[in-house]
């Protein structure tokens, strides 16, 4: 009986492989399906479940010389091959070289391979799969990043391809320990969506929804009308109308979770941050788009990627200009840090996968095995560090100002400043003018002011107050004349000059996204005095 590599031909101490696998079967309970997330409907068991929950298998790919020559000339064009795993044999399996700029290797080197099982033989499956990938993991020496990150997405409610490890041989040449991933195909869609008849797009390399993305599954030939409609929604100038249309076309909750996890795992090369490494599914029954993660072999490497950041992908950039959705994004990160992205949740799964990996490291050359173990320990440490960093970022993040139910807030805790920033000389309380009156005297040309920083969500606002002047001489000024209100970076209309009794003041402004603003109550002039009633300072959302 043979199991794994041919016991007579493999030099990696393969004679111990059956014993290791049997031990692993007892340890893990091979064949158990993935645990069902609380609050969701249990899915039916699938023929592929044992591939990802059972023992690590070996695969031998045999390609005829003529087909090898074809892959040397056209590595992305599938050729027929024979695939073996244990006593199982599959003929006419489509095989091609895969990989992006950093991971592509030639067929004669350490190639990453895509196996289209039914490419040349309709209906054929390998362990229940139509399509699978054998990744060389040249950018992830731990062979763990993709598997662990995909598990995070699935537990958070975002579909992601399952992964496991595999020992791979090509034409009798041992390639070593690979990461095996299920492919994005019809089978994947059927397992994860109620309606699997929609269009599944491959984002390709640095391509966005304004382009004709490659169709992996769906309506043939593609007309990209659904992508064009999504792009058109993102270009709507009016923020309210844009939000309404995106809410109809995008699975809002899953997109917020997807984006949060992209940042939490420091996925600098995914869709939100770089318009790369993603799939996009248009589910017809719901008529909504769902973004799916891909290419997660370089995670947790950016020493504290900030969560408060801008985004490059068209949908992400427009989506998170909306203040409510941006606030929901931060809240989702905070929520995930309590129930999914925690060391108590991640590390047991990580350690179980590590233990599963250990079952086959005995079959790998000693130096290579030790290198893998060191990389696994390093990745584990980076995950712990990232969890701590995220908690610190959430704790230290400035919170948007909370307005009262009527959309207003009384403004207090002002800081005084004069034109040269020396602590507000010429500014003082004046009890004779009122219990909370502030007086600003201009003994020489200047612009004394009161200032207050607030973080505000998108919207239209009116900054209100009350002021008076005496003998205020104020010539024309680029930012405003006399006594008045404004926010930093904006110009106000002329204010009070000369001598004036108490008058209401106001300044209106609009924010397109959540923004930190500096409110300013100022006196600009050559000489004279001005007063502000600090009890009257108020901000109202229009």
Locations of regions flagged by a protein language model:
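Bacterial N-terminal signal peptides
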Residues: 16-28
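Phosphate/dinucleotide-binding and metal-coordinating scaffold of catalytic cores
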Residues: 30-404
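Extracellular and organelle-lumenal recognition/adhesion modules and their flexible linkers in secreted
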Residues: 397-542
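Residues that act as N-cap/strand-start positions at coil-to-secondary-structure junctions
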Residues: 2, 75-77, 160-162, 274, ...
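Residue-level detector of intrinsically disordered/flexible regions characterized by low predicted structural confidence
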Residues: 4, 17, 30, 419-420
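N-terminal secretory signal peptides that target proteins for export/translocation
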Residues: 1-13
């Amino acid at each position: 009986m043979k199991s794994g590599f041919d016991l007579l031909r493999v030099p990696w101490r393969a004679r111990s492989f059956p014993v290791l696998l049997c031990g692993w079967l007892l340890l893990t309970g091979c064949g158990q399906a993935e645990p069902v997330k609380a609050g969701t409907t249990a899915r039916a068991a699938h023929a592929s479940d044992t591939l990802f929950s059972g023992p690590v298998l070996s695969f031998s790919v045999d390609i005829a010389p003529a087909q090898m020559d074809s892959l040397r000339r056209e590595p992305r064009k599938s050729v027929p091959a024979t695939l073996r795993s244990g006593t199982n044999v599959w003929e006419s399996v489509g095989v091609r070289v895969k990989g992006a700029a950093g991971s592509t290797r030639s067929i004669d080197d350490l190639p990453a391979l895509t196996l289209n099982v039914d490419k040349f033989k309709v209906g054929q499956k390998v362990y229940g799969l139509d399509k699978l990938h054998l990744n060389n993991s040249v950018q992830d020496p731990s062979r763990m990043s993709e598997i662990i990150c995909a598990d995070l997405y699935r537990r958070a409610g975002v579909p992601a391809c399952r992964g496991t490890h595999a020992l791979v041989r090509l034409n009798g040449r041992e390639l070593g320990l690979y990461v095996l991933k299920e492919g994005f195909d019809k089978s994947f869609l059927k397992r994860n969506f109620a309606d699997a008849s929609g269009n599944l797009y491959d984002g390709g390399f640095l391509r966005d929804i304004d382009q004709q993305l490659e169709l992996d599954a769906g309506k043939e030939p593609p007309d990209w009308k659904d992508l064009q409609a999504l792009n058109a929604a993102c270009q709507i100038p009016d923020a309210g109308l844009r939000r309404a249309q995106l809410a109809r076309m995008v699975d809002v909750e899953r997109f917020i979770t997807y984006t949060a996890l992209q940042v939490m795992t420091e996925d600098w090369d995914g869709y939100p941050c770089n318009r790369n490494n993603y799939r996009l599914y248009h589910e017809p029954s719901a008529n909504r788009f769902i973004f799916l993660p891909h290419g997660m072999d370089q995670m947790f490497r950016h020493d504290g990627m900030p969560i408060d950041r801008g985004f490059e992908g068209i949908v992400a950039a427009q989506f998170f200009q909306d203040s409510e959705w941006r606030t929901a994004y931060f809240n989702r990160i905070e929520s995930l840090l309590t129930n999914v992205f925690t060391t108590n949740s991640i590390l047991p799964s990580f350690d179980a996968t590590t233990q599963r990996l250990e079952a086959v490291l005995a079959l790998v050359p000693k130096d290579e095995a030790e290198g893998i173990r060191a990389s696994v320990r390093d990745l584990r440490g980076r995950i712990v560090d990232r969890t701590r960093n995220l908690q610190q970022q959430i704790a230290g993040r400035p919170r948007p100002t909370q307005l009262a139910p009527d959309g207003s807030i009384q403004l207090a805790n002002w800081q005084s400043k004069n034109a040269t920033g020396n602590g507000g000389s010429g500014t003082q309380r004046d009890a004779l003018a009122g219990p909370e009156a502030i007086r600003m005297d201009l003994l020489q040309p200047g612009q004394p002011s009161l200032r207050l920083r607030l973080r505000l969500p998108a919207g239209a606002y009116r900054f209100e107050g009350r002021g008076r002047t005496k003998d205020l001489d104020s010539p024309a000024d680029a930012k405003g004349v006399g006594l008045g209100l404004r926010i930093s970076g904006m110009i106000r209309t002329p204010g009070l000059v000369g001598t004036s009794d108490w008058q209401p003041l106001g300044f209106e402004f609009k924010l397109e996204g959540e923004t930190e603003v500096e409110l300013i109550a100022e006196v600009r002039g050559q000489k004279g005095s001005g007063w502000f009633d600090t009890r009257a300072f108020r901000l109202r959302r229009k």
